[in-house]
Protein backbone atom coordinates (compact mmCIF):
# COMPACT_ATOMS: atom_id res chain seq x y z
CA UNK A 1 0.00 0.00 0.00
CA UNK A 2 1.12 3.51 -0.84
CA UNK A 3 -0.26 6.95 -0.15
CA UNK A 4 -1.08 8.85 -3.36
CA UNK A 5 -2.76 12.28 -3.34
CA UNK A 6 -4.31 11.67 0.08
CA UNK A 7 -5.65 8.17 -0.59
CA UNK A 8 -4.19 4.75 0.06
CA UNK A 9 -3.72 2.58 -3.00
CA UNK A 10 -2.73 -1.04 -3.30
CA UNK A 11 0.00 -1.78 -5.80
CA UNK A 12 1.00 -5.15 -7.18
CA UNK A 13 4.13 -5.72 -9.17
CA UNK A 14 6.14 -8.85 -9.92
CA UNK A 15 9.58 -9.30 -8.40
CA UNK A 16 12.00 -11.13 -10.62
CA UNK A 17 14.89 -13.17 -9.38
CA UNK A 18 18.11 -11.34 -10.13
CA UNK A 19 20.09 -12.95 -12.95
CA UNK A 20 23.72 -12.43 -12.05
CA UNK A 21 26.13 -11.99 -14.91
CA UNK A 22 28.79 -14.02 -13.09
CA UNK A 23 27.60 -17.29 -11.52
CA UNK A 24 27.98 -17.77 -7.80
CA UNK A 25 29.66 -20.93 -6.45
CA UNK A 26 29.15 -23.93 -8.71
CA UNK A 27 29.65 -27.53 -7.69
CA UNK A 28 30.26 -30.71 -9.69
CA UNK A 29 30.77 -28.70 -12.88
CA UNK A 30 33.99 -28.70 -14.84
CA UNK A 31 35.29 -25.23 -15.75
CA UNK A 32 34.52 -23.83 -19.18
CA UNK A 33 37.57 -22.73 -21.16
CA UNK A 34 38.69 -22.02 -24.72
CA UNK A 35 42.30 -21.74 -25.90
CA UNK A 36 43.04 -19.71 -29.02
CA UNK A 37 46.59 -18.90 -30.10
CA UNK A 38 47.82 -19.80 -26.62
CA UNK A 39 45.38 -17.38 -24.98
CA UNK A 40 43.23 -19.07 -22.34
CA UNK A 41 39.71 -17.69 -21.99
CA UNK A 42 37.03 -18.55 -19.46
CA UNK A 43 33.85 -16.98 -18.12
CA UNK A 44 33.91 -14.92 -14.96
CA UNK A 45 32.51 -16.87 -12.01
CA UNK A 46 32.96 -17.13 -8.28
CA UNK A 47 34.97 -20.33 -8.78
CA UNK A 48 37.35 -18.41 -11.04
CA UNK A 49 37.64 -15.53 -8.54
CA UNK A 50 38.47 -18.00 -5.78
CA UNK A 51 41.74 -18.83 -7.56
CA UNK A 52 43.07 -15.70 -5.85
CA UNK A 53 43.73 -16.10 -2.13
CA UNK A 54 41.51 -13.59 -0.33
CA UNK A 55 39.84 -13.06 -3.70
CA UNK A 56 37.53 -10.32 -2.40
CA UNK A 57 40.69 -8.21 -1.90
CA UNK A 58 43.18 -9.56 -4.45
CA UNK A 59 41.20 -10.33 -7.60
CA UNK A 60 41.23 -7.63 -10.31
CA UNK A 61 38.88 -4.79 -9.34
CA UNK A 62 37.02 -4.99 -12.67
CA UNK A 63 36.25 -8.67 -12.01
CA UNK A 64 35.00 -7.88 -8.51
CA UNK A 65 32.77 -5.08 -9.75
CA UNK A 66 31.25 -7.25 -12.49
CA UNK A 67 30.76 -10.12 -10.06
CA UNK A 68 28.91 -7.93 -7.58
CA UNK A 69 26.98 -5.61 -9.89
CA UNK A 70 26.75 -7.29 -13.29
CA UNK A 71 23.26 -8.29 -14.43
CA UNK A 72 22.52 -10.58 -17.37
CA UNK A 73 20.84 -9.21 -20.45
CA UNK A 74 19.81 -10.68 -23.78
CA UNK A 75 23.00 -9.28 -25.32
CA UNK A 76 25.34 -10.36 -22.52
CA UNK A 77 24.97 -13.70 -20.79
CA UNK A 78 28.56 -14.08 -19.55
CA UNK A 79 31.73 -12.06 -19.01
CA UNK A 80 34.60 -13.54 -21.01
CA UNK A 81 38.00 -13.29 -19.31
CA UNK A 82 41.48 -13.69 -20.74
CA UNK A 83 42.82 -15.84 -17.93
CA UNK A 84 46.40 -16.39 -19.00
CA UNK A 85 48.78 -16.49 -21.95
CA UNK A 86 50.58 -19.74 -22.73
CA UNK A 87 53.87 -18.43 -24.13
CA UNK A 88 54.46 -19.20 -27.80
CA UNK A 89 55.84 -17.43 -30.86
CA UNK A 90 52.21 -16.72 -31.86
CA UNK A 91 51.54 -14.49 -28.88
CA UNK A 92 54.88 -12.79 -28.22
CA UNK A 93 54.21 -9.41 -26.66
CA UNK A 94 50.87 -10.37 -25.15
CA UNK A 95 52.27 -12.02 -21.99
CA UNK A 96 51.16 -9.21 -19.68
CA UNK A 97 47.57 -9.01 -20.89
CA UNK A 98 46.12 -11.74 -18.69
CA UNK A 99 43.28 -11.12 -16.23
CA UNK A 100 41.36 -8.91 -18.65
CA UNK A 101 37.76 -8.97 -19.81
CA UNK A 102 36.92 -9.22 -23.50
CA UNK A 103 34.96 -6.40 -25.07
CA UNK A 104 34.80 -7.60 -28.68
CA UNK A 105 36.17 -9.90 -31.35
CA UNK A 106 36.31 -8.35 -34.81
CA UNK A 107 33.94 -5.64 -33.48
CA UNK A 108 31.36 -8.23 -32.35
CA UNK A 109 30.52 -8.29 -28.64
CA UNK A 110 30.30 -11.93 -27.53
CA UNK A 111 27.14 -12.96 -25.64
CA UNK A 112 28.73 -15.95 -23.93
CA UNK A 113 31.58 -18.45 -24.28
CA UNK A 114 29.87 -20.44 -27.03
CA UNK A 115 29.29 -17.31 -29.11
CA UNK A 116 32.85 -16.15 -28.40
CA UNK A 117 34.31 -19.47 -29.58
CA UNK A 118 32.15 -19.49 -32.72
CA UNK A 119 33.29 -15.96 -33.65
CA UNK A 120 36.92 -17.05 -33.36
CA UNK A 121 36.35 -20.36 -35.16
CA UNK A 122 34.67 -18.69 -38.14
CA UNK A 123 37.14 -15.80 -38.43
CA UNK A 124 39.45 -15.49 -41.42
CA UNK A 125 42.57 -13.42 -41.90
CA UNK A 126 43.50 -11.46 -38.79
CA UNK A 127 41.43 -11.70 -35.61
CA UNK A 128 41.15 -8.52 -33.56
CA UNK A 129 40.38 -9.17 -29.88
CA UNK A 130 39.74 -6.02 -27.84
CA UNK A 131 39.76 -6.00 -24.04
CA UNK A 132 37.64 -3.72 -21.87
CA UNK A 133 40.67 -1.51 -21.22
CA UNK A 134 41.07 -1.06 -25.00
CA UNK A 135 44.08 -3.34 -25.45
CA UNK A 136 44.11 -4.83 -28.96
CA UNK A 137 45.30 -8.38 -29.57
CA UNK A 138 45.83 -9.30 -33.21
CA UNK A 139 46.32 -12.91 -34.29
CA UNK A 140 46.58 -14.43 -37.76
CA UNK A 141 43.98 -17.22 -38.04
CA UNK A 142 46.18 -19.38 -40.28
CA UNK A 143 49.07 -19.19 -37.80
CA UNK A 144 46.71 -19.94 -34.90
CA UNK A 145 45.45 -23.11 -36.63
CA UNK A 146 48.98 -24.21 -37.52
CA UNK A 147 50.26 -23.61 -33.98
CA UNK A 148 47.35 -25.09 -32.03
CA UNK A 149 48.73 -28.63 -31.65
CA UNK A 150 52.21 -27.33 -30.83
CA UNK A 151 50.89 -25.21 -27.96
CA UNK A 152 48.60 -27.93 -26.58
CA UNK A 153 51.44 -30.46 -26.73
CA UNK A 154 53.97 -28.15 -25.07
CA UNK A 155 51.63 -27.47 -22.13
CA UNK A 156 50.24 -31.03 -22.05
CA UNK A 157 46.66 -29.87 -22.52
CA UNK A 158 44.45 -32.56 -24.08
CA UNK A 159 41.97 -30.24 -25.81
CA UNK A 160 41.70 -26.60 -26.84
CA UNK A 161 38.27 -26.29 -25.22
CA UNK A 162 36.12 -27.67 -22.46
CA UNK A 163 33.65 -30.45 -23.25
CA UNK A 164 30.68 -28.08 -23.15
CA UNK A 165 32.19 -26.17 -26.11
CA UNK A 166 32.96 -29.30 -28.15
CA UNK A 167 30.09 -28.58 -30.57
CA UNK A 168 31.56 -25.20 -31.49
CA UNK A 169 33.71 -25.88 -34.54
CA UNK A 170 34.40 -24.00 -37.73
Where are these regions (language model features)?
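C-terminal recognition in membrane/secretory proteostasis and scaffolding
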Residues: 1-170
